[in-house]
C-alpha cells in the first residue's frame, strides 16, 4: 500500500514594484503606512511580511515585499475589503505596478547556501 506524501507548505512572496512620478510611489507607501492599512494587512491571518523599501539610488520606484503562508491566505487577502482601500490609494497617487511572484523551494537543500551567508 503506497502512502501519499504529506502536502508541502508553499509560502508565497510577491514583490510589487510601485512606479510613479514626482515622488508619488513614495507618497503612496507613506499613506498606506500612516492610514493603518499596512498594520491591518500585517494582522491578517497568514501574512508573513508586508514591507516597503526605497532604492538607495533614489528614483521613482518603491518595492513592496508581500509574503503569505499559502495561496489560501493570499486569496483571502485579495477577497478582503482591504483591496478596495489599496486600489483607491493606488488611484489617488497614480502609481503603476510591476509584479514578481515566488513560491518557496522546499526541495532545495538550503544548507548548501549557508556558506555564503554571514550571520
PLM feature spans:
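Short, flexible segments with low predicted structural confidence
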Residues: 4, 12-13, 29, 45-47
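Short, surface-exposed ligand-recognition loops at beta-strand->loop->(often short) alpha-helix junctions
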Residues: 19-32
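Glycine-rich beta-strand-turn "strand-cap" elements at beta-sheet edges
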Residues: 1-10, 52-60, 85-119
Amino acid at each position: 500500500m503506497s502512502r501519499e506524501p504529506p502536502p508541502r507548505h508553499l509560502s508565497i512572496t510577491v514583490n510589487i514594484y510601485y512606479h510613479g512620478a514626482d515622488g508619488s510611489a513614495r507618497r503612496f507607501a507613506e499613506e498606506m503606512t500612516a492610514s493603518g492599512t499596512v498594520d491591518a494587512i500585517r494582522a491578517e491571518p497568514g501574512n508573513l511580511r508586508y514591507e516597503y523599501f526605497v532604492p538607495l539610488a533614489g528614483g521613482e520606484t518603491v518595492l513592496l515585499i508581500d509574503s503569505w503562508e499559502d495561496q489560501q491566505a493570499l486569496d483571502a487577502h485579495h477577497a478582503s475589503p482591504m483591496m478596495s482601500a489599496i486600489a483607491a490609494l493606488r488611484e489617488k497617487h497614480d502609481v503603476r505596478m510591476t509584479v514578481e511572484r515566488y513560491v518557496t523551494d522546499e526541495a532545495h537543500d538550503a544548507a548548501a547556501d549557508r556558506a555564503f551567508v554571514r550571520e
